[in-house]
Amino acid sequence: MPKKFIVANWKMHKTVREALAFLDEFIPITKGLNGREIGIAPTFICIESVGKVLINTSIKLCAQNAFYENKGAYTGEVSPAMLKDCGVEYVIIGHSERRKYFYENDDIINKKIHACIKEGLKVIFCIGETFEDRQNNKTMEILKTQIRNGLLEINSPEALTIAYEPVWAIGTGVVATEEQIKQSHLFIRNQLKEIYGERANEVRILYGGSVTPENIKSIMAIDNVEGVLVGGASLDPLKFAKIVKY
């Protein structure tokens, strides 16, 4: 059984100084914690500094994004090869904020997943429906489309983690109900089984969307929830430590 995976997505927060101050407080109070894997995804500008600290811990260095080419005239982009060189192990691909603000579609996301896996990186592939999708009973249809298109010709389930993040629950304080999470995670698991057969069990499915120290226990008790992707609550070392220690 894979370890539970708890990932901090800092988004566009923390200077290098603030990131290092977080680690100074967070690492000692979570040291020696067994039975779970912890990941932290800082901004690109903090990756090298954070990575130098994490190298002496079991915490995994994650990135929030990557481009689908390893080099070239792509102003402002960062390649999988560059991230790997900095010690990154996991890359978040397909986050709803990337889809919304940077117009990333399933084709771009699929190319990014291919590029990261080819470089030996593991991928945290984000999927999720909007509030309008759920109101129109299209949740499963949307999830199926995102999974099938995003994982097209991806034959390495051992390199994949899926993060189910209903868009309407991200940063809103609104958490999907236990039944909604259970149904969606079961659907995702079954989709993965259709694609990968028994190898689908190698893929962890995380929940993301207003995860807090107050709701982490109930979320982790839901079937097929094998971790969480944490946004706002991961910015505070004490709050994130409480989530990790649930």
Curated annotation (Swiss-Prot):
Pfam families registered for this protein in UniProt: TIM (PF00121)
Subcellular location(s) of the protein: Cytoplasm
Family matches, as PROSITE patterns: TIM_1, TIM_2
EC number of this enzyme: 5.3.1.1
Residues at the catalytic site: 95 (electrophile), 165 (proton acceptor)
Molecular functions per Gene Ontology: triose-phosphate isomerase activity
GO cellular component, one term: cytosol
Enzyme class: isomerase
InterPro entries from the UniProt entry: Aldolase_TIM (IPR013785), TIM_sf (IPR035990), TrioseP_Isoase_bac/euk (IPR022896), Triosephosphate_isomerase (IPR000652), Triosephosphate_isomerase_AS (IPR020861)
A GO biological process held by the record: glycolytic process
Listed pathway(s): Carbohydrate biosynthesis; gluconeogenesis; Carbohydrate degradation; glycolysis; D-glyceraldehyde 3-phosphate from glycerone phosphate: step 1/1
Main location: cytoplasm
The protein's assembly and partners: Homodimer.
Family, as annotated: Belongs to the triosephosphate isomerase family.
Function: Involved in the gluconeogenesis. Catalyzes stereospecifically the conversion of dihydroxyacetone phosphate (DHAP) to D-glyceraldehyde-3-phosphate (G3P).
Name recorded for this polypeptide: Triosephosphate isomerase
Gene, per the UniProt record: tpiA
